[in-house]
Amino acid sequence: MTEAKSYKDTVNLPQTRFDMRANANKREPEIQQYWQEKGIYADLADNNPKDLFVLHDGPPYANGALHMGHALNKVLKDIINKYKLLQGHKVHYVPGWDCHGLPIELKVLQSLKSSERAELTPLTLRHKARDFALKAQQEQAVGFQRYGIWGDWKKPYLTLTPEYEAAQIGVFGAMALKGYIYRGLKPVHWSPSSRTALAEAELEYPEGHTSRSIYVSFPITQAGEKAAEILAPYIDDLAVAIWTTTPWTLPGNLAVALNPELTYAVVETESHIFHRSYLIVALDLVEKLSETFGVKLTVKVTLQGESLENTCYQHPLFDRVSPIVIGGDYVTTESGTGLVHTAPGHGQEDYVVGQRYGLPILSPVDAAGNLTEEAGKFAGLNVLNDANEAIINALQDQKVLLKEEAYEHKYPYDWRTKKPTIFRATEQWFASVEGFRDQALKAIKEVTWIPTQGENRITPMVGDRSDWCISRQRAWGVPIPVFYDEETSEPLLTEETINHVQQIIAEKGSDAWWELTVEELLPEAYRNNGRTYRKGEDTMDVWFDSGSSWAAVANAKNRPLKYPVDMYLEGSDQHRGWFQSSLLTSVAVNGIAPYKTVLTHGFVLDEKGHKMSKSLGNVVDPYQIINGGKNQKQEPAYGADVLRLWVASVDYANDVPIGQGILKQLVDIRNKIRNTARFLLGNLHDFNPETDAVAYEDLPELDRYMLHRMTEVFTEVTEAYESFQFFKFFQTVQNFCVVDLSNFYLDIAKDRLYISAPNAPRRRSCQTILQLALENLTKAIAPVLCHLAEDIWQFLPYEKPTESVFQSGWVNLDAQWQQPQLAQKWVSLRQLRDGINQLLEQARRDKVIGSSLEAKLIIVDPRTAESGTDEKQGENFVHWFYGWLENFNEPTFDPNDRKISLRNIFLTSQVEFIKSAEIEPSFTYEETVVINLERHDNNIRTKPIKIIVTKADGHKCERCWNYSTQVGSFSDDPTICERCNEALQGNF
């Protein structure tokens, strides 16, 4: 008995060194090293032919390890930058860091012993803070680069460098000389725990804050002119009722504000149980206050709010009389009494009203939050601790406390120390937003906001905001370059002094403010002018630091950037942070927004949609995603591309989830894309596009349909990138790899690729499509899966078109590939194929067949002799479609025949067409497949086509595994079919 002949070496199996596994932890750093050694980013950034695109980096804080928010933000930016590079734009991305401010200062102080803190000078603290910031910045930079982020890493911008600080002084100076900077005693958000003023963006409002709210009666001493007659019967036993959630501010009370549009009532208290028998309250609140006080209130008389103006009352705890004044629409009947306790030193609205009435600014609280001597017997008490208790007790002693109750509400906390803040009037430096508010609002309208609700968020923030307090009482920051006359305390701030300090800081850095004497810091003209000066001790708000980056970076002469820049991209919290501070400084100095487009993203949550916190144990660490955890089996190293794919998969306009379940799904998708590319690479091992590619007009229909499909897919991908909707890229590419390629085209292609003669036209035609799909797919995924794309490119089995995939340009689509009419037929055919696959799967499950090649497919002629009028269009299509199917004859053995048979498409050994009358009962499986037929008027008609699956005829070919009745017909090769016989001779 002769041994069976082996045909293994005659089959064109895939060949590639491209690994099935990503080995990301090893391979990604190698690819990053390759980019660096070849200078890929620098070459493209400088030499691409199209206009410069600048996405200006919002500086993360140089403090602590990177978290998922950093990853989301930086990867989004990098996807956009890499897409722009592939589109041919020059791109200069300068990563930045915010290096000054309280958080770093606190970290330094926490690292010192109490004895060291006591001896700390401002300069020593600054040196330690600088070292801390630089170390954190360098660690973060390494992390960002491991994400695959491209940028000018050798020359980032740091807000602590002399050139940056000097540019910031320049912005401050320009605003000062325009009259937008002033010094004033105003209430500001003050953090007793940090002992400094805070900006709105440095506050947070945690849930669950409870205040001691009180209702208090202030005895009326004299009625105002308009109310005298109405109040006369009650004046000797009358009080005004107020409500406050901050009892500690009562020592600063200088007025009671009302709403002139509201109606107020004099009410009599049942049994006259209070200090005064009659109270003034808002009419709409009488019933509610009766319930609150637990006493019946009877309305005696009503009067309009404006008539109560200038009615006076006695402060219950201090020997002073104050007026009732007209406030604004902030006085409502939603809570309280409709009358608001007003302390101009402890609130912005109170301050504005106080200025209108010429009230003094009384703020008897020191930097630590302790009441001062101006608070009389309450001096020394802390406003956030024991002051409330003492003041409430004193009110009770005076019998003016109407009610106390716990009140849960949102209250501002210091975002760093996590402790409550207060409003406190202090001498501060302000930017007068009022001076350029209208310009800022106009500039907002000229910006493209993505998503569009971003404009709706920032507009009221700018429209309603008060002047910007830009001074801080800390050492680690850029100094406000002001001098004070020793005799009068008048500030000295002129063009000459600002320019002189700016030049010094440009040369020596801001430490010079502390190192040099006043004489050295002053221009010569001010050194001997008969006056003596002292340096100011305030530093600038860090939001002024980062808000000046458009001047220090984008508009810097030593950087190849531009101003305004194309895009700012940060989290949605930056509408009140960096987006706003940048807008205000740029508009104040130049009258324009510093950006053309602003894109915002949400926050990262855990898999269940909860906020991440160490206490909950639900923190996902980007470092661990990339490098794996301690137990690599439970927490494997997924690499940066999986992290980047996650960013592209989510709708970042909202808050986005991440967790192990999501990551595992993304790994599967990354692997599917990788394995698709590996198949393409492996089947191009002997293909040279220069000599082997088949011209479009010579391609069979299936291949031309796939080119049409590529135009659809990669046009959608391009639109996804252009609209910054990367989740659409994610869905489209995933679908293309799995549905169009793996499950359809490549499934069909294996027969042509493996079985045909190596140089057969039908095989070369298929390889032409594979090569175009591979290169376009690689380019399309490159902005997101940058390491995988480069890995694929480096393993191209023919001469690479360019050194790096990023030098190859964007996807290459030919207009002639678009063939919608051709596509319509193939869409219907794919629907038919899906139905056939289900029937084959059923036969497999029942073990009637193993492989689909063991089956013969029978298609029953759906054409009828007559058609009704309504169905005529659909019937005509069915006639034509069935006829088209019948034309898929077996290809001849002419070497130039590139036809694809239906059995290849359906992956069966035979396909047969029969009339319905010919159906025999022995047929095994029968099903009706409904296909959608698109009419000329775009209406859809559904038509059924009957299909039958039965056992294939003949015997199995040992080479291609198809069944054929001609197996055994060839004496030299008795175990192969007619196709394989011709293929071995080079004819098929």
Swiss-Prot record:
SUPFAM superfamilies named in the record: Anticodon-binding domain of a subclass of class I aminoacyl-tRNA synthetases, Nucleotidylyl transferase, ValRS/IleRS/LeuRS editing domain
Record GO terms (molecular function): aminoacyl-tRNA deacylase activity; ATP binding; isoleucine-tRNA ligase activity; tRNA binding; zinc ion binding
Cofactor: how bound: Binds 1 zinc ion per subunit.
Pfam families: Anticodon_1, tRNA-synt_1, zf-FPG_IleRS
UniProt-annotated binding residues for ATP: 614
Reactions this protein catalyses: tRNA(Ile) + L-isoleucine + ATP = L-isoleucyl-tRNA(Ile) + AMP + diphosphate
Subcellular location: Cytoplasm
Cellular component aspect of the GO annotation: cytoplasm
InterPro entries per record: aa-tRNA-synth_I_CS, aa-tRNA-synth_Ia, Anticodon_Ile_BEm, Ile-tRNA-ligase, Ile-tRNA-ligase_type1, Ile-tRNA_ligase, M/V/L/I-tRNA-synth_anticd-bd, Rossmann-like_a/b/a_fold
Binding site for Zn(2+): 957, 960, 977, 980
Motif ('HIGH' region): 60-70
Top-level enzyme category: ligase
Domain remarks: IleRS has two distinct active sites: one for aminoacylation and one for editing. The misactivated valine is translocated from the active site to the editing site, which sterically excludes the correctly activated isoleucine. The single editing site contains two valyl binding pockets, one specific for each substrate (Val-AMP or Val-tRNA(Ile)).
Complexes and interactors: Monomer.
Similarity section: Belongs to the class-I aminoacyl-tRNA synthetase family. IleS type 1 subfamily.
Protein name: Isoleucine--tRNA ligase
Protein's organism: Synechocystis sp. (strain ATCC 27184 / PCC 6803 / Kazusa)
